UniProtKB/Swiss-Prot annotation:
Residues 7-189 form the tr-type G domain. Keywords: Cell inner membrane, Cell membrane, GTP-binding, Hydrolase, Membrane, Nucleotide-binding, Protein biosynthesis. It comes from the Bacteria. Pfam families: EFG_C (PF00679), GTP_EFTU (PF00009), GTP_EFTU_D2 (PF03144), LepA_C (PF06421). This is Elongation factor 4.
Amino acid sequence: MTDVPVSRLRNFCIIAHIDHGKSTLADRLLQDTGTVAGRDMQEQFLDNMDLERERGITIKLQAARMNYTAADGESYVLNLIDTPGHVDFSYEVSRSLQACEGALLVVDASQGVEAQTLANVYLALENDLEIIPVLNKIDLPGSDPERIKEEIEAIIGLDTSTAIACSAKTGLGVPEIMQAVVDRIPPPADTIDKPTKALIFDSYYDSYRGVIVYFRVISGRISTKDKVLLMASKKSYELDEIGVMSPDQCEVNELHAGEVGYLAASIKAVADARVGDTITLLNAPADEPLPGYTEAKPMVFCGLFPTDSDQYPDLREALDKLQLSDAALKYEPETSSAMGFGFRCGFLGLLHMEIVQERLEREYDLDLIVTAPSVIYKVNMIDGQMLMVDNPATLPDPQRRESIEEPYVRMEIYAPNEYNGTLMGLCQERRGEYIDMKYITTERVTLIYELPLAEVVTDFFDQMKSRTKGYASMEYHLIGYRRNDLVRLDVLINAEKADPLTTIAHRDKAYSIGKGLVEKLKELIPRQQFKIPLQASIGSRIIASESISAMRKDVLAKCYGGDISRKKKLLKKQAKGKKRMKAMGKVDVPQEAFMAVLKLNQTS
């Protein structure tokens, strides 16, 4: 099955913004090449997780090998590597691009170029990939292929005279795409005689065989009897099996340079076979690994607590298992007086956080409370030390710290130009600095802003979508840290600090956030038998307060008339009981209260 000469191999991926029809096109290619029989076909074939199908997004990378007979009568092997399209998973995209020689750039013929497409195109150009523009959804009444071609030329600078118009849904134009892959994407370099190197572009955990690693052989060859060495983790393994995905796994004896396949070697955790790592042979290792390997760094942090403290061991086990298949997830134990035991987790971004939370609740049947997300702050101490703080509750006291720096991102927003004003207003509200504005076409504009990551991770995306009726798209990347006048905003419920509600805010916005927060808590926390004071404070200064009045039982109901001193005695007894209750009582804070912290930026 693998005796195909290198000249007849093609490795390519599909680049597209969310919802532009990437998974549908992948389905169509699998069907047209007979890789998947019609009866086995289901929509979004390569999106294996239920969550992926429901949200209509690709999270984990998939790969498929297709046999195709071209117009010249030769049979070719096409390896399609599916990529995620969301900004959180851009590292996964960059690695899958490294495993390819070409890419199909799929653009919705009615919507045009979106931010995420652009980010991935730049990654593809950095990797010197041959890019074939494809205009999808041309069967829709609103499609305007000529305008979109102009847009692609204006924004990306690609020649669109050979762009292929298609409809992945009806199959129109798909044969032309297949032929273009063969004609225009170069074959892999013929490096079978060089030392063996293979790039890991994905891995997932299989409970029976351990970690299954997807890789692309860059040079040399790998066969079943080899012992392999992973160069970044310095671990060696004996291979149990190697094979190709077509799209179900199919065992083979050997893979050579240019081919894409999988291997199983009883690897215990995904962290041992990191994406981007280089596989080489143990007895004849390569001199140096392939370039570009970096460990995925979490950008967004939040606390995860089980609603029932008995579930804490289950949560630990679930996170351990998730980490086996998601090496970007980081976590450590955390305790809080208000919430009990839980974990502080780090994620690539907000979508990644939501997906992990949803997978924990779905696949492991856990009830979770999630605290507001925060970012990593750099704190410069008076004694010259520098601390990295990812949990607002652990921020040192003002007397000990000299300054706080927060991460900034450079953001590009693509939108129709009638939404210019509202988008600029949104960026201004979020402490954004205006950098530039470019007109791509007469109707579409690019806004470039630099803003604090903390302002982006809450609900910036939702706000942007709702203000532009869903037409805007954005892309951002980290540009470094900047010093700002930041303060720690504590929330006290019944004179007790609620750590999970602590946030770090800019001094100018602290008052409105604090006021909004206590007002929101007043609505959300149920009334108790005693009065609950709610306060927002910066250090020892209370900047906003509200109180939830007590529920009152009428103790005088049974005194019809009677002596006033009797009534006073009963009221005094009630007041005494309430005082004791207040000293002893614990206030349960509902999950909505923690999420309220997130939503406050809308109003502040």
